Regions:
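Non-catalytic terminal accessory segments
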Residues: 1-61
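Membrane-embedded segments
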Residues: 71-170
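Conserved beta-sheet core of the metallophosphoesterase superfamily
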Residues: 216-296
Length: 298
């Protein structure tokens, strides 16, 4: 992320607190004009803003989904923390606390750890050390080509990778690891030009293969006969999930939204898309709280 976007995101975050002045103005206006309908409308508008800005983005939901793939595994799936301008280590601590309450085989993180962060990164990632399960991850587009402050791309990648490693997070792009009764492989981010599914396509192991990637648009091009399931993120479920409107802003070309999607064509794996934990652009969510997904594979 370029230099100007970092202070811009921080300014947007701080200016949103001015809503409290709007409350004062609405009440003062009522006492001056005694217009109850006008007051009700203004308070409703301000209340909706407060919910979207201050309540829902800080409410961490839990969602459990059973998926049949032919082998048992219990996976905690999270993504899109977007640490930096809007969320920090205190939010991660709450996420880690909830993860540690789960009985699972591993934790998978589907990318986009960052959004307009300031260096150093270690304080943001430090709470991840507290996760008591094996943690495997891939990176997303905001971790690769929209990082910022302005650094060379190679240096950016090195900083992110090393900071996550120090926090106990193992990046598994083009690798295979075991999680319960399944094998998991990581595929790099599509938008960052790092999508490479050769390891998945060459897999011939006995365990069903689960592919972890950031962008669900990777799934139709996977062409991995052993692949039984793709886990992805990126969409935020629209973030501000206003019915009928949010689908117009989903950052995907395929029919991917949130939750479990059936195979697009025979031979394709199903795709599960988590709606993530953080926010980009506007620091708001609606009808779509941050979520920790618990997947019971069987």
């Amino acid at each position: 992320m370029s230099d100007w976007k970092v202070p811009a995101a921080e300014a947007m975050f701080m200016l949103s607190h001015l809503v409290w002045l709007y409350f004062v103005w609405a009440i003062w206006s009522f006492w001056r004009r005694r217009n109850k309908a006008s007051l009700a409308f203004r308070l409703l508008l301000a209340g909706a803003f407060v919910w979207m800005r201050f309540v829902e983005p800080n409410w961490i939901a839990r969602q459990e989904t059973a998926i049949a793939i032919g082998a048992p595994a219990r996976i905690v799936l999270v993504s899109d923390l977007h640490l930096g301008a809007y969320k920090g280590a205190d939010f991660v601590e709450r996420v880690v606390e909830q993860i540690n309450a789960e009985r699972a085989d591993c934790v998978l993180i589907a990318g986009d750890f960052l959004y307009a962060p300031r260096l150093p990164l270690d304080p943001l990632f430090a709470p991840l050390k507290g996760i008591k399960l094996p943690v495997y991850a891939v990176l997303g587009n905001h971790d690769r080509n929209e990082f910022g402050p302005s650094l060379t791309e190679a240096r950016e990648i090195e900083l992110v990778d090393q900071a996550l490693q120090r926090a106990g997070v193992r990046l598994i792009e083009n690798q295979i690891v075991n999680c319960g009764g399944v094998a998991v492989t990581g595929i790099g981010d599509r938008w960052s030009g790092r999508e490479d599914a050769r390891v998945a396509r060459a897999y011939k192991g006995d365990k069903p293969l689960v592919a972890l990637t950031h962008n669900p648009d990777t799934a139709p091009d996977l062409n991995a006969p052993a692949g039984k399931l793709v886990l992805a993120a990126h969409t935020h479920g629209g973030q501000i999930r206003i019915p009928w409107l949010y689908k117009k802003v989903l950052p995907v070309s395929g029919p991917f939204d949130a939750g479990l999607h059936a195979p697009l064509k025979p031979g394709d794996p199903p795709v599960f898309v988590t709606t993530g934990l953080g926010e980009t652009a506007l620091p708001m969510r609606l009808f779509n709280p941050p979520v920790i997904d618990v997947l019971q594979l069987h």
